[in-house]
């Protein structure tokens, strides 16, 4: 699959989607995007900047949601224009899809909306590549139905059917907890779509702090190493210069100062993983 001018897949080095969870300020977006651009350029990692203009799924009604669609997209457009970076944001409504598609390069669907057929059809007909997140409640093999819906909708609209990615972000495991079943990364390949691992939301503890979600950011390196060892097309990571002060998902954000060291380790693993054939593809024969 071609994404933002580069090839992605298991025959390519992993690409990275990264940035702050939510648009907090123009300065934070520009500074973080600039730092990430420097890091990924030095390592040769294809990079897409991400941030959300609205966090519609919050633990509490008083939680910070973002600057809103108009202001948020304006800031993301500036990142794209001044830093020359492709940009991704998530959408929650059909109106969001229409407006965001005018600005960003890649759209993303929230995990909780993966079974909403009309929504998936609408985003699939936006004309943009889409990173479709697997719901925390969904079996990995059920993502084939979701991807098939998107492809059918794209075909109806006369659009390419290979513009979709399947993203793993953990599975609910009791109350306020998620686990990552690494088998899911191999199972989701059966969708025929490139598989992306969301390394930061996978360590989230949903609602674990009462009115906010908790997280175990120290487990991001652990799970991201495991995912790269399995073999993925891309990685998704939220990052912040000061996670303790982040206005959303700080407990599971990668400290920006540690991003380069983490990516260096993951690059080395990725090269080993993709050097030879994936034996799981032949064990049944």
Swiss-Prot record:
GO biological process, one term: keto-3-deoxy-D-manno-octulosonic acid biosynthetic process
Main subcellular localisation: cytoplasm
Record's subcellular location: Cytoplasm
InterPro entries in the record: Aldolase_TIM (IPR013785), DAHP1/KDSA (IPR006218), KDO8P_synthase (IPR006269)
Disulfide bonds: none
Single GO term (MF): 3-deoxy-8-phosphooctulonate synthase activity
Reactions performed catalytically: D-arabinose 5-phosphate + phosphoenolpyruvate + H2O = 3-deoxy-alpha-D-manno-2-octulosonate-8-phosphate + phosphate
Pathway assignment: Carbohydrate biosynthesis; 3-deoxy-D-manno-octulosonate biosynthesis; 3-deoxy-D-manno-octulosonate from D-ribulose 5-phosphate: step 2/3; Bacterial outer membrane biogenesis; lipopolysaccharide biosynthesis
Gene3D superfamilies (UniProt xref): Aldolase class I
Pfam family membership, one: DAHP_synth_1
This protein's UniProt keywords: Cytoplasm, Lipopolysaccharide biosynthesis, Transferase
CC annotations in GO: cytoplasm
EC number: 2.5.1.55
PANTHER family: PHOSPHO-2-DEHYDRO-3-DEOXYHEPTONATE ALDOLASE (PTHR21057)
Family per record: Belongs to the KdsA family.
Protein name: 2-dehydro-3-deoxyphosphooctonate aldolase
Natural source organism: Variovorax paradoxus (strain S110)
Origin organism lineage: Bacteria, Pseudomonadati, Pseudomonadota, Betaproteobacteria, Burkholderiales
Gene coding for it: kdsA
